[in-house]
Amino acid sequence: MVSLGRACEVAFQIRMHSDKIDSDFFDWLITPFDGLMAALRSNLDGLLEADELYLQNDKNFVNNKKTGIQYGHVFMRDESHNIPDNFLDDLPRVRDKFDYLRDKFFNNAKSDDPICFVRRDINSIQAKMLEEQLEAMFPSLDFKLACVNAEDVGLGDAKSPRIIDLRIVNGAHDGLGFPEPWAEALTGAGLTTKPFVKTKEDIVIPFH
């Protein structure tokens, strides 16, 4: 399983209920749908231009004003656990990290192994758009798209055997989700055989 956002909850729950330990490109980002599509259409290039980044007032996120993507677990923090005003000094390291994750994303998608992409808060029109974008990028890839929503959003209208409808209640205030409904949904869809293989304490979130 590979997270396509919308936020950290997806990556966190994938780790809790599988053997996955390594990071993927979108794992610890907040990614609005339009930002996700823009990132994919750009082949994950040019998303960290210095003149497009700004520090949010609460100093918890660096935001991209062009894509709307928010980086909360990427830039180093100071002793007060804030992202410092001089966050751009850390940009070379952050770019190196995302260059690596970009290469990993494409290498995995070009392998013979099937992939299930997982996206939270996505309607049927968006699901179809995302499926078509992934197919255009990786025409030989055997993939599924698991769409996670708290209620019925008409995903059946997309009429695609690739799209999996997962109904999972909205997460708690910590943004990491409720493990029990995730375990039930992932197991029921055949996406994991190892629910609760890790505890919350086992999962390392960078700069959390």
Task: Identify the residue ranges that each predicted region occupies.
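Extracellular glycan-modifying ectodomains
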Residues: 1-208
